[in-house]
Design a protein with these regions (language model features):
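Ferredoxin-type iron-sulfur electron-transfer modules and their immediate structural context
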Residues: 2-121, 127-128, 138, 142-192, ...
Length: 217
């Protein structure tokens, strides 16, 4: 609602060095008191007049305004922490627990999280993240958390690698499939412990792609 959005703006201004109370909600029933407030001396502007064209959607306009406030800030900061629920922020992934299943990629509505087309990799673009939480709720390993904040500079608009692993390669044809660590975990769990994987040839099929497993049987 309105109060939540004003809270986000107040946090941004304070993070950029402005004193508290720059954003206020006037709830006054007395018309004379309201008139006195409206005609009173205004506070100094938080930023000079902008020289940008207000083009794009709501999020693009918010970014333009935030960049202008950052340029004229008393104490510019590269990153400003925001309250929970703010529509800007980053996704933090505990890399050790991530299996690169890419469930989060499929759930992300803005494309902030993306997979690499050729390698087991998870990439993230902070500027596209709206902190909806779908990735966190979808993650089967529960290794994703949200960090509401506003980052300035070109780094926020560039994709960063959150997790990358060596791909598993089929021992028969060399085709890449899955991640090497996940395949080896499966081998360690099943080899000798399951009746279907008592002989070395059956275990070796676990290290083959789907096509080669069919051919080798």
């Amino acid at each position: 609602g309105l109060l939540a959005n004003l809270g986000h703006l107040e946090a941004l201004l304070e993070g950029l060095g402005h004193p508290p109370g720059r954003v206020q909600v006037v709830a006054e029933e007395d018309p004379d008191a309201l008139e006195a407030l409206l005609w009173g001396p205004p506070p100094p502007p938080a930023a000079g007049s902008g020289d940008f064209l207000p083009m794009g959607g709501k999020r693009a306009l918010l970014r333009l305004v935030a960049d202008r406030l950052h340029a004229d800030a008393p104490r510019p900061a590269e990153v400003v922490a925001l309250p929970e629920g703010a529509p800007f922020g980053r996704v933090v992934v505990e890399a050790a627990g991530c299996t690169l299943c890419h469930a989060c990629v499929g759930a992300c509505p803005t494309g902030a999280l993306e997979a690499h087309p050729e390698r087991p990799m998870l990439r993230f673009t902070e500027d596209a993240c709206v902190q909806c939480g779908l990735c966190r709720n979808t993650c089967p390993e529960k290794v994703i958390r949200l960090e509401p904040r506003l980052a300035f500079g070109p780094a926020a608009r560039e994709a960063v690698i959150l997790k990358e692993e060596e791909p598993a390669r089929c021992v028969r044809c060399g085709k890449a499939f899955g991640t090497k660590s996940s395949i080896e975990r499966i081998v360690a769990r099943l080899a000798g412990a399951h009746w279907m994987f008592q002989d070395p040839e059956a275990v070796e099929r676990l290290r083959m792609c789907d096509d080669c497993r069919v051919v080798s049987q």
